[in-house]
Amino acid sequence: MIFFYMNPILIAAAIIPAIFLLVKVYKADRLEREPPLLLLSLVLYGIIATGLAMVTEHLGSVVLNSIFSQNTILYNVMMYFIVVAFSEEGFKYLLLKNRTWYSPAFNCQFDGVVYAIFVSLGFALWENIGYVLRYGFGTAMVRAVTAVPGHACFGVFMGAWYGLAKRYDNMGKQSASKICRFMAFLLPAFMHGCYDFIATMESVHYGWIFVGFIAVMFIIALLVIRNMSKHDRYISYSSTYF
């Protein structure tokens, strides 16, 4: 009922970027499109991850504030790399694996990318609504080209390793699968930490670094999507690609 009392223009501005990216990724799934109900559930899991991350981030900030002085380099590193990035990417990954690892629909390597992006954009969608309602339309425009596609990029990096982990698991290579699953959490968490850390530094130089970081991250993510979509194959095949 709460949505009836919200500005529909702000709500649209908050959700359209995420929906646009979801449609693009869905269409990139070349071999076999995923069940719509599964994808919808992943978006909902992403929304759940938002709430869980809010709790752990609040608790983490309380602990950090009792140990470190705020707005120092060390404080920001601990906050954005450990508290924020580990919380958000950790819950995304845990819910992603819980919902999809044993799903019969998870039969292609690119599926890992699709699933991870849907969870990430579910997270971004709900987070974006909160920011836009609090700060207005200008925030929606900025986040439409930064935070929302940023979460999608984190999902690409998570999903690329996650899909590879599933293939190794199917091949019986459990050690390789575990390493890939660990990377599916660690790499997006590191990229997320870099994103937040650079974005919060109050310096013109860091502003340009942030723009460059986003540009490089977007380009790499798009290349990964294009390559994995083009060369996608069923998990049952023994060969790998990345």
Label each residue range with its predicted role.
Residues M1-F242:
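Hydrophobic alpha-helical segments at protein termini of multi-pass membrane proteins
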